[in-house]
Regions:
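Basic, Lys/Arg- and aromatic-enriched nucleic-acid-binding interface segment
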Residues: 141-173
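Catalytic-site neighborhood detector that most strongly recognizes the C-terminal catalytic loop/helix
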Residues: 300-325
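Active-site/catalytic core of tyrosine-dependent DNA strand-transfer enzymes
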Residues: 217-271
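Conserved tyrosine-mediated DNA breakage-rejoining catalytic core shared by Y-recombinases
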Residues: 178-223
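Short, charged phosphate-coordinating catalytic segments
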Residues: 111, 166-192, 294-295
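Short, basic (Lys/Arg/His-rich) helix/loop patches that form interaction surfaces
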Residues: 238, 259-298, 302, 317
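N-terminal core-binding DNA-recognition domain of tyrosine recombinases/integrases
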Residues: 13, 28-134
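C-terminal secondary-structure termini that scaffold catalytic or DNA-interacting sites
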Residues: 1-14, 326-340
Length: 340
């Protein structure tokens, strides 16, 4: 896991039993609406968690007022309490306010017959300045290789294969758990054998998520894939999943296992390591090799080219250094995927 986030327990079954029944009913109706438009259960659970925090705050500090009757002053009071008393981060406050805003939009558009005068006031109240509270680790290509070497030396071939897939494919940890062994057969090689192209894999997205063909740098990933598959054959590990659940190989590995692995890797690396850092490392490495942003966008599967800049950890100076030197402008040959 690597990074530490302050966890502040606000709700409890005892407190939730005391919240205004109208607030509970409103939340339940909202949840039914979310399911009717195919929002994912993980998204819905996030809404429930946020709203329950708001209801308990209202119980303890706002006279247990029905949400429809909240004023901007109530929003300010809750925000101030979260920031200065409960020590929540600005990002956490923004997320909770986003959930309240979504609920407000639902009331305004769906419940207008019951509450014709209701208006969404959440974003009328300025949010605290967003600033990172967790340490961000920027992994260099050398650090990634050191991690892979150490895991291989220790015989942790499953972990090495996972890191290689994260570092040379840029997928999220939950997505990596969904890869099958068949996604890395010779028939999956494209672009002159430089990339593996998987069958469609469920990725993060609205509703049930979207399905994408995921690309992985074949030459860099294959040695770690081969070692893991050899280990599996020697130890009788049979499963369609690349990373099977140890207790039930018919199922894929759980994200909780990945989090445990990241704690092990953090100890080996000597710096906080979390799975998403490899997504940044992959994007940065492609940029370092001179691939245009529009190509990186297609490889990772982003809809917007702006995502490349978000995940690219290269400094402005590093970028300029690729194109300018002692003799002025450098002439660079265009990098091909087959060169990687």
């Amino acid at each position: 896991m690597g990074r530490k986030t302050q966890m502040n327990q606000i709700t409890s079954p005892e407190l939730l039993a005391q919240v205004n029944p109208e607030n509970t009913a409103l939340m339940n109706d909202f949840v039914d609406y979310l399911r009717s438009i195919q929002r994912s259960e993980s998204t819905i659970n996030g809404y429930i968690s946020d709203l329950q925090i708001a209801w308990v705050w209202s119980l303890q500090h706002n006279g247990n007022k029905f949400f429809v009757d909240w004023t901007k002053r109530n929003i300010i009071a809750m925000q101030n309490w979260m920031l200065n008393e409960n020590k929540n981060s600005p990002a956490r406050i923004r997320r909770l306010k986003a959930s309240l805003s979504s609920l407000s939009n639902y009331i305004e558009s769906v419940c207008d017959d019951e509450y014709p005068n209701f208006r969404n006031i959440i974003h009328k109240v300025e949010s605290p300045v967003n600033q990172p509270v967790r340490e961000k680790t920027v992994l260099s290509e050398e650090q990634v290789q050191e991690i892979l070497d150490k895991l291989t030396e220790l015989g942790k071939y499953d972990m090495a294969c996972f890191v290689a897939l994260a570092a040379y494919g840029g997928r999220r940890k939950a997505e990596i758990c969904r890869f099958r062994v068949s996604d890395f057969g010779d028939d999956k090689l494209v672009c002159g054998g430089s990339l593996y192209k998987s069958d469609p894999i469920k990725t993060k997205g609205r509703g049930a998520g979207k399905y994408l063909n995921c690309y992985t740098l074949a030459k860099k990933f294959k040695p770690y894939f081969d070692r893991w598959m050899e280990y599996r054959e020697q130890n009788g590990i049979e499963s369609e999943w690349l990373f099977p659940n140890r207790s039930n190989p018919a199922e894929q590995m759980q994200v909780s296992t990945v989090n445990s692995w990241m704690e092990t890797i953090t100890r080996l690396a000597g710096v906080p390591v979390y799975a998403h850092a490899f997504r940044h490392a992959f994007t940065t490495a492609l940029s370092n090799q001179g691939l245009p942003d529009n190509v990186i966008k297609e490889v990772v599967g982003w809809e917007s080219i702006e995502m490349v800049q978000i995940y690219n950890d290269r400094s402005t100076e590093d970028t300029l250094d690729m194109y300018f030197g002692e003799d002025g402008i450098k002439i660079r040959e265009q990098t091909k995927l087959s060169d990687l």
